[in-house]
Amino acid sequence: MMKPQHGGMAGHGGGRTRSPFLTSYALTLAFITFVSVLYFKDFSSTLHQPFLTRPPPHRRQIARPRAPSHHHGGGSSSGGGDVVPPFAVGAAAAAGCDVGVGEWVYDEAARPWYEEEECPYIQPQLTCQAHGRPDTAYQHWRWQPRGCSLPSFNATLMLEMLRGKRMMFVGDSLNRGQYVSLVCLLHRSIPESSKSMETFDSLTVFRAKNYNATIEFYWAPFLAESNSDDAVVHRIADRIVRGTALEKHARFWKGADILVFNSYLWWMTGQKMKILQGSFEDKSKDIVEMETEEAYGMVLNAVVRWVENNMNPRNSRVFFVTMSPTHTRSKDWGDDSDGNCYNQTTPIRDLSYWGPGTSKGLMRVIGEVFSTSKVPVGIVNITQLSEYRKDAHTQIYKKQWNPLTPEQIANPKSYADCTHWCLPGLQDTWNELLYSKLFFP
């Protein structure tokens, strides 16, 4: 501003002699202005964002993660404003919509996502068609939330977002079923020569080599150490949990970018749970009994502490899948009082149905414990929508662990499995919910 003025003064009045005072004043003022400009530029640079070029706040907040790098802060159910969780690629279709509330819609055109024989990773305990199930209707039901829709599962998108990452499921056989379901949903998008699955004791690893990604399952039915930790030989009636000891298992969880926990079925042994104080190697074992809800909360609190100490919410995500219901008494939903899930071919239509085998007390513990976590833990609530699916269990159409007796053969419902689920089927929907929470929170 001063230079034009100073230049004008220099040319004014033709050859008039300049005053030494005016010349000195002009030079001093010009020097001050020059230094001020330099200082302003340096101060702006110090902030790494020049004042006049700072982008609007909303532009900085909605930047989407780029695979494979994820540097966003973690989201939280207790707040977090516009902070985008890691792996998010978009917002939920309808804010405030509870995807766990809705109904099952029969849709032969859109379900199943894959055929049983197309996925070589399904265990024979879950291949219902191969073991003689006469109907396929259980494969064709699509979950429709009330007031919104789930985002369509995109295997290519998920694999791209998992590039260079490690995703791990931790829990029991129901969590393993969900793990296998996810592998089946993804594997067709991976060339045959670029994928593999291996099992190492309690750890199963599926590798998508082109993406340098792994999807893993780790057997830990109680999450804490227990006498049921053998991934194959674990049918123990007298179950004992070693307090809050996670170290044996948790060393395998470290380094995972996405963790998906579950733990419920193995806790359903009665009102009391045996808790070991000390080690399984101790000659004299100190075992106490605790109320199941108290013991369950104790272990989940230990999981929360581990998550807070080991998972960075800026580049990782943690989920907990709620309880999977059973359908062992058909009188619970108004059918023949002597039956169970055997020969059931349609879902329960009563939207208020909640089976007696599903503990609301443990459900409450899940909500209370994970709501205190300093690292966000996403709850994948599969319970209510699964309550309706009395038709989706493996029933008798699976590999049997032991030869059937003549009495069992004469009475199929006596050995029907009303706990586990056929694949493809219900657990694919669980992964649709997980997909929604992971990429469209």
UniProtKB/Swiss-Prot annotation:
**Where in the sequence does glycosylation occur per the annotation?**
N154, N212, N343, N381
Keyword Transmembrane included in the entry's annotation: yes
**Keyword terms, alphabetized:** Disulfide bond, Glycoprotein, Golgi apparatus, Membrane, Signal-anchor, Transferase, Transmembrane, Transmembrane helix
The Enzyme Commission number assigned here is 2.3.1.-
GO BP term (any one): xylan acetylation
Q: Which residues lie on this side of the membrane: Cytoplasmic?
A: 1-19
What are the GO cellular component annotations? Answer: Golgi apparatus; Golgi membrane
- Listed Pfam families: PC-Esterase, PMR5N
Task: Name the residues annotated as catalytic in the UniProt entry.
Answer: S173, D417, H420
In chain numbering, motif GDS motif lies across: 171-173
Q: Does the keyword Nucleotidyltransferase apply?
A: no
Q: Which residues cross the membrane?
A: 20-40
Instruction: Please report, in chain numbering, the residue ranges of the motif DXXH motif.
Output: 417-420
- Which residue windows does the record flag with biased composition (Basic residues)? 56-73
Compartments, as annotated in UniProt: Golgi apparatus membrane
Identify its membrane topology class: Single-pass type II membrane protein
Cystine crosslinks: C97-C148, C119-C184, C128-C422, C341-C418
Give residue spans on the Lumenal membrane side. Answer: 41-441
Q: According to the UniProt record, where is the region Disordered?
A: 50-81
Subcellular location, principal: Golgi
Describe the family membership recorded for this protein in Swiss-Prot or TrEMBL: Belongs to the PC-esterase family. TBL subfamily.
Function as written in the Swiss-Prot or TrEMBL entry: Probable xylan acetyltransferase required for 2-O- and 3-O-monoacetylation of xylosyl residues in xylan. Possesses extremely low activity in vitro.
- Name listed for the protein in its UniProt record: Probable xylan O-acetyltransferase 10
Q: What organism is listed for this UniProt entry? A: Oryza sativa subsp. japonica
- Per UniProt, what is the name of the gene that codes for the protein in this document? XOAT10
